[in-house]
Design a protein with these regions (language model features):
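Acidic-glycine-rich active-site phosphate/pyrophosphate-binding loop
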Residues: 10-21, 43-66, 135-139
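DPxDG-like acidic metal-binding loop motif
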Residues: 83-93
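Active-site-proximal helix-loop elements at catalytic-domain edges
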Residues: 24-52
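A short glycine/serine-rich beta->alpha loop
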Residues: 26-33, 67-75, 146-151
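Short, contiguous, pocket-lining structural segments
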Residues: 34-38, 55, 76, 153, ...
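Amphipathic alpha-helical interface segments
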Residues: 39, 44-49, 87-88, 98-174
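FAD-binding core of FAD-dependent oxidoreductases
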Residues: 75-85
């Protein structure tokens, strides 16, 4: 797995005090460890931006809920990647079905984000990312114990996906 870039702390000055703001990756890691699934953790790391677009935190959590475990624990596309795409679509997606150029541009963005994730982690498929870990497709999620968190890379994958999207959004601010 790539080096952890999400531990960087961003400092902002406001009047005479310095406020440390966590990266989106740090937020996603914490959210996953609070019990949100991988897709929800990445999505909710961008809750403020989504709320500014009229998507409440609760709605965002609900929209992302199906993508955990590689789409309902089917172990297909990693939920972190799905969350990243979901947020990108909400913030930068196209809405006109006839806008072919906008659709193409958006698909290109998503492919670039997914390629970056794959380059940093070796895959974007859940069962491949969890190689060597029980990846059954039973719909019953495992209990979130300390052992669960130690054996799975999911918290770090959520951090990685959120950091990739955060960099993308900063680079593409309009």
């Amino acid at each position: 797995m790539a080096e952890n870039k999400s531990m960087d702390i961003v400092e902002k000055s406001t009047k005479n005090e310095t406020v440390c703001e966590k990266s989106r990756g740090d937020r996603a890691r914490e959210l996953f460890r609070e019990g949100y699934n991988c897709s929800q953790a990445v999505t909710l790391a961008f809750a403020e931006e989504l709320e500014a677009r009229g998507i409440s935190r609760e709605m965002a959590a609900g929209l992302a809920s199906s993508f955990g475990g590689g789409l309902g624990r089917l172990r297909e596309v990693c939920g972190c990647v799905s969350g990243m795409a979901l947020v990108c679509g909400a913030l930068e997606g196209y809405t006109d079905p006839k806008a072919a150029a906008e659709k193409q541009d958006h698909y290109k963005k998503i492919q670039e984000l997914v390629t970056t994730f794959k380059n940093e982690n070796g895959s974007y498929i859940c069962r491949e990312l969890l190689a060597g870990i029980n990846t059954d497709t039973n719909p019953v999620p495992e209990a979130r114990t300390e052992s669960y968190y130690k054996k799975r890379p999911c918290a770090e994958l959520a951090a990685c996906a959120a950091d990739i999207l955060e960099r993308h959004l900063k680079e593409n601010q309009k």
